[in-house]
Amino acid sequence: MMITQELELKENISQDVIFPPNDLYSDEPPVETELHLEQIMLLIKCLKWLWKDRYDFYAAGNLTIYYSPNQKKSEYFRGPDFFVVLGTERKTRKSWVVWNEDGKYPNVILEILSPTTANTDREYKKELYQNTFRTPDYFWFDPYTLEFAGFHLLDGKYQPLEANEKGHLWSEQLNLYLGIHEGLLRYFTPEGKLVLTPEETAERLAAKLRELNIDPNTI
């Protein structure tokens, strides 16, 4: 969320109003470009597909996180482009309300850079996620310039992650690599294999069947 938009929201909401936790909808504005949306949806789709048998995580994008110690919607909120919380119930949410989620903050956050948000993502948000959220893994990615960086929280401070020989960065929290593939950020297994989307999985299966002279449309 842009800082000016956040300030406008705060001015329009009474500081004394305490909202019921279950009524907190996300305040995040639309994503900046179609490519931003494609990248966010790709990360969510791939992780949910890979972890389809798991029910102990929550992955979302462009969703507001409310973290006010006073349990007020009007103060202390932020909406990462993509985040993952581990050790929680996998269910649909209107927003992530820290005081309604046993005090849990995201384990992984990724921000998608743009000309209007890049400096905030690199500086202010990095400090916020380090000092307040205490998020173990923080990444940012620019789908236009392909700038990609990652950090891991060590002794309370973010330390830059070193890329492997393929340029991938390791997420200790996800037990996966993140790396650029065909211009978009994707997951890779510890062995370096691309984590496929459901559509890619189906396409590869269909191709394999055709190699065996089996028409996939007949199955």
Language-model region placement:
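A short acidic/basic microdomain associated with nuclease active sites
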Residues: 55-68
